[in-house]
């Protein structure tokens, strides 16, 4: 299966945005975008001025990389979002936020979405009491996500939970750290997303 092979730090520098792809490192002075706030490459310090299409494309690429998706996956989410009731941009972001790997990340069981995706694939979580190992599994409001009993001593999970207060838990999620369990209480609102995303640019790009 195809996947991103570029350094996470290079991705953040290319997008000129701290996307917290390296977990704890992003909160320290070792963060690459803090030390070198310009694109990677020989001519990185001279940023290119994009056309209207270029701005739309960069926004799509940024969100794809933020959630770790490939083009076919992302386009599929857009088509489902445009077919649903409501604003296409809001629908798109809600679908991305309610992916199981993202929910695991938001609950604080992993430092990054990429790590959350690996943990899900390795069968460390159960959804409403049933083990699920599909990162794209769509979580619904009222759903409980729990670390399986034998995985509660996994160092990556316990260490991530120790620093969850620094990262914060969104309002649409409740977390019981002692029980290694979280619940999606409602559908996330646009206001719950703190990352600077201009979803309308993505809608305009795909609408052409």
From Swiss-Prot:
Transmembrane segments: none annotated. GO terms for cellular component: small ribosomal subunit. Keywords: Ribonucleoprotein, Ribosomal protein, RNA-binding, rRNA-binding. GO terms for biological process: ribosomal small subunit biogenesis; translation. Residues 98-161 form the S4 RNA-binding domain. Belongs to the universal ribosomal protein uS4 family. NCBIfam families: PRK05327.1 (NF003717), rpsD_bact (TIGR01017). This is Small ribosomal subunit protein uS4A. It comes from Myxococcus xanthus (strain DK1622).
């Amino acid at each position: 299966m195809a996947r991103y092979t570029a350094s996470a730090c290079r991705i953040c520098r290319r997008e000129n945005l701290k996307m917290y792809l390296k977990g704890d490192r992003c909160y320290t002075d070792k963060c690459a975008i803090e030390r070198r706030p310009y694109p990677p490459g020989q001519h990185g310090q001279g940023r290119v001025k994009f056309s209207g299409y270029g701005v739309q494309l960069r926004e799509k690429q940024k969100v794809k990389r933020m959630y770790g998706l490939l083009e076919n996956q992302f386009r599929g989410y857009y088509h489902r979002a445009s077919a649903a009731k409501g604003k296409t941009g809001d629908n798109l972001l809600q679908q991305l936020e309610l992916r199981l790997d993202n929910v695991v990340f938001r609950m604080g069981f992993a430092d990054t979405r990429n790590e959350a995706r690996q943990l899900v694939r390795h069968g460390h979580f159960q959804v409403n009491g049933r083990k699920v190992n599909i990162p794209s599994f769509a979580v619904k409001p009222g759903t409980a996500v729990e670390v399986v009993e034998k995985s509660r001593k996994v160092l990556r999970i316990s260490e991530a939970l120790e620093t969850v207060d620094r990262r914060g838990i969104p309002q649409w999620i409740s977390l019981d750290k002692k029980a290694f369990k979280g619940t999606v209480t409602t559908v996330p609102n646009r206001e719950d997303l703190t990352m600077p995303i201009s979803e309308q640019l993505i809608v305009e790009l795909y609408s052409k």
